[in-house]
Amino acid sequence: MKTTLIDNDLTLAVEDAIPASPVYAPEEILALAVCASPNGSRDAGDLALLHAARERGITLPYAQRENSWEAPSRERPYSTAVLKAADKADASPFMVARGNLKALEKLCEVSSLEKERMNTAFEEHSPSGFEPVAVAVHRSGAPWRLLGVVPMHAMRDVRRLSMAKANFRYFHVWDWPLRVLHW
C-alpha cells in the first residue's frame, strides 16, 4: 500500500516496509521508524512516516525516552533513540537506529544473504527519488539487528520552483516594443 503526503512543493510517498528477515512484520518496522523520530518533529519525512502509519491503522506501541534522540552526524549517518513499550511499566528500554541503509548494514554486520534479499526487494522500486529508511534495533545483551527498510520516494514539484525562480529573476529590459524600435 502506498501512502502519499504533500507538504508544500514536496510530495512524499511511503510504501510498505521490506523486512530484512521473514520474522519481522512490515507494520512493526514502520511503527519503529515512526517512534524513532524526534518528539514534535515537523520534518516532512517524519510527518510522511507518521501519516503512513495512521493511514494503515498501525498503533504506536512504543514511547521515546525524554531527550534520548540523537541526530545523525558525519561519523554516524543515522539517528538513534531509546524506546520503551508504552503499555508496560516494567518493560526494558532498547535503542533504535534509523537512517542510511549502508551504514546500518555495516553497524549490524548484515550477512550477504540478507543484503541480497534486500537488493532483490529494491529492484521493483524506481531509482528516481527513492530513499530507503532503514531501521535497526539494539536490545541489552544482544547485537544490533537490522529489521528492514521503509521505502520512501521524495519528489519536488520543480515546475513551480522553476517558475517562481524565473518570476523572481526576470526583469523586462529587452521587451517587444524595444525590439521593434531597434529593428
Label the model's feature ranges.
Residues 152-170, 179:
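Short, acidic loop-to-helix structural element flanking the phosphoryl-transfer center
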